[in-house]
């Protein structure tokens, strides 16, 4: 089970916004770049001013980013804006945005730098395995349990928690460790999906 499974419901809530954007000549690539810029600026702020209270921004920015990601996909598919450049921007933008938004956790008190770096590596590995499925079988794997939407929810909630209760940062390393395990599990599941689909064919 992963939050990706409720994506169609989320998209239906954004459809009116999508049509408004299309009417005003906003393209899928514009939205992708806006999400990337928002992530980079937020990450830079959190790194330069590593104060727990500022992590209150994280759930807000992550929610906006997820909405923008949904909108760029809808514009691409439903408004005939799918391009090779768009695919490149989408995939690289997702990875860069994840790094930009989650790297600041490294600068929080009580955070072990190696654990945060390991978690970021596992995040990249997970997305690579999802793309590997598309390379081999033509269908990208979004298998869980810790996909992009799930990460946004958990890390957004943690950002909210430590901004309100800074003492909770003593549990930072436990969360990074659990997240790394879940990410590795997700990577394995995505690779297994490749093998199962290949076997069925």
Question: Which residues fall in each region the model found?
Answer:
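Hydrophobic alpha-helical transmembrane segments
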Residues: 1-63, 100-201
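Glycine-rich active-site/cofactor-binding loop and its immediate structural neighborhood
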Residues: 55-87
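Basic, amphipathic juxtamembrane/active-site segments
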Residues: 74-114
């Amino acid at each position: 089970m992963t939050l990706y499974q409720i994506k169609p419901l989320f998209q239906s809530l954004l459809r009116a916004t999508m049509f408004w954007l299309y009417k005003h000549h906003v393209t899928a690539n514009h939205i992708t770049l806006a999400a990337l810029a928002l992530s980079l600026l937020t990450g830079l702020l959190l790194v330069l001013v590593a104060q727990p209270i500022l992590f209150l921004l994280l759930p807000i920015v992550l929610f906006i980013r997820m909405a923008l990601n949904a909108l760029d996909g809808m514009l691409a598919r439903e408004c005939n804006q799918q391009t090779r450049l768009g695919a490149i921007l989408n995939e690289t933008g997702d990875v860069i945005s994840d790094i930009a938004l989650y790297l600041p956790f490294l600068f929080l008190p009580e955070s072990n730098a190696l654990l945060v770096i390991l978690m970021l590596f596992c995040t990249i590995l997970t997305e690579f395995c999802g793309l590997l499925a598309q390379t081999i079988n033509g269908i990208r794997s979004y298998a869980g349990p810790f996909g992009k939407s799930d990460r946004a929810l958990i890390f957004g909630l943690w950002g909210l928690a430590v901004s309100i209760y800074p003492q909770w940062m003593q549990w930072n390393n436990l969360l990074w460790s659990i997240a790394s395990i879940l990410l590795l599990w997700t990577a394995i599941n995505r690779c297994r999906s490749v093998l199962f689909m290949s076997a069925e064919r």
